[in-house]
């Protein structure tokens, strides 16, 4: 079928992206779903820092690639053996879980090796690609395969994905809420619940108040924890206070005031943010790093403090989540009025506005910009 989507043509394009235009919006061909796959009509897709990290070259992926990994939509067709019904609303998650590998047996601590390999290759978890487009190399007509982004490729009117990349939700969950569950909430909330595991009454600090960090803050507040929000952007600190943070300050002030917590989540994806998060971690506490810095980034911490203060440092990919287990938990918090996810939405945009939206995200001024279809 013919669809419209946003394709990344090159990595490491110069900013501003509104001028360099590394992403083009145009027609593509989408093959029907194969065994264990579903065709999803995309309703809403979120623009995340993981999208930006591919565009700016921090996370190199094969191109051309149809971007987008955080989304919600409705199943319109199914391949052989698929269990989902047509008409079912689903949350799309960016790490398929085969359920069979040794990594899947770690209950979310490690990402699925099968899904990770497919994501790195730009294929679906079952192998192969379902996307292509007309191509004119040197003036001769042809067809070019287009890679999938993290098994989803949600910046399009439709997507074919493995059933292992989606989680069904009830129709009362609006698509804008459902989309946020697939990455921001799974990652940020999971960093708190699955990796940090604060005890009742423990204070939680979050360093980096983008979409993932603010989601971590929301989940921690929903679970009754006193929360410290840390960010360099004053508007984000103000929003953190509005969303229930007991304290919201800049990084240097947090260190100067010795605002320590038993659980500290680093969600900025930078070495300096990691150092700040470690400095704010109380003796015996846990530093959870969920951000994705450049592969060459290096941080400096004191090994003596790690030993003498019995500290723990935990890496948490996708919030150490098992999506089929965790998404229903967040839905229940939302239904109870304890998880105001609409507060994460900073802008609603169209596909054609993606280059400008990428610039806003890179500047640090945006939380979650949602592409509405």
Annotate each PLM feature:
Residues 1, 324-373:
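C-terminal hydrophobic helical "lid"/dimerization subdomain
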Residues 1-72, 153, 157-161:
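Short N-terminal strand-loop motif that marks the start
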Residues 4, 203, 226, 286, ...:
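Residues at the starts of beta-strands that form the adenosine-phosphate
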Residues 86-89, 150, 157-158, 164-251:
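Mid-domain Rossmann-like dinucleotide-binding core that forms the NAD(H)/NADP(H) cofactor-binding site
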Residues 94-158, 162-163:
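Cysteine-cluster motifs in flexible loop/terminal segments that predominantly coordinate metals
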Residues 271-338, 373:
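Glycine-rich phosphate-binding loop and adjacent beta-alpha segment
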């Amino acid at each position: 079928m013919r669809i419209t989507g946003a394709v990344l043509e090159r990595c490491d394009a110069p900013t501003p992206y509104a001028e360099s235009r590394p992403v083009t919006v145009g027609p593509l061909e989408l093959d029907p779903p194969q065994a264990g796959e579903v065709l999803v009509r995309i309703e809403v897709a979120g623009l995340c820092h993981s999208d930006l990290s591919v565009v700016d070259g921090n996370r190199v992926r094969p191109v051309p690639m149809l971007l987008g990994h955080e989304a919600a939509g409705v199943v319109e067709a199914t391949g052989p053996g698929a269990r989902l019904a047509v008409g079912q609303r689903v949350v799309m998650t960016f790490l398929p879980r085969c359920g069979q590998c040794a990594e899947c047996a770690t209950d979310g601590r490690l990402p699925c090796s099968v899904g990770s390999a497919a994501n790195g290759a730009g294929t679906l978890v079952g192998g192969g690609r379902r996307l292509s487009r007309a191509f004119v190399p040197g003036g001769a007509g042809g067809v070019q395969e287009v890679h999938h982004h993290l098994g989803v490729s949600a910046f399009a009117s439709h997507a074919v994905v493995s059933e292992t990349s989606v989680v069904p939700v009830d129709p009362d969950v609006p698509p804008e809420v459902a989309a946020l569950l697939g990455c921001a909430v799974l990652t940020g909330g999971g960093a708190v619940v699955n990796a940090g595991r604060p005890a009742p009454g423990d204070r939680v600090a979050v360093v980096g108040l983008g979409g993932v960090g603010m989601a971590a803050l929301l989940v921690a507040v929903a679970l009754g924890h006193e929360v410290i929000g840390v960010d360099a952007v004053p508007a984000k600190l103000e929003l953190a206070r509005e969303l229930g943070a007991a304290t919201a300050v800049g990084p240097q002030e947090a260190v100067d005031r010795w605002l320590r917590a038993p659980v500290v989540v680093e969600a900025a994806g930078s070495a300096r943010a990691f150092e700040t998060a470690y400095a704010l971690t109380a003796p015996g506490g846990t530093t959870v790093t969920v951000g994705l810095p450049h592969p060459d980034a290096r941080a400096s911490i004191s090994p003596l403090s790690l030993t003498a203060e019995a500290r723990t440092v935990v890496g948490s990919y996708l919030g150490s989540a098992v999506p089929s287990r965790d998404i229903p938990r967040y839905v229940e918090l939302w239904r109870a009025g304890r998880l105001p996810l609409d507060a994460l939405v900073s802008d609603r945009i169209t596909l054609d506005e993606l280059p400008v939206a990428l610039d806003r995200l890179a500047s640090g001024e945006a939380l979650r910009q949602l592409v509405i279809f």
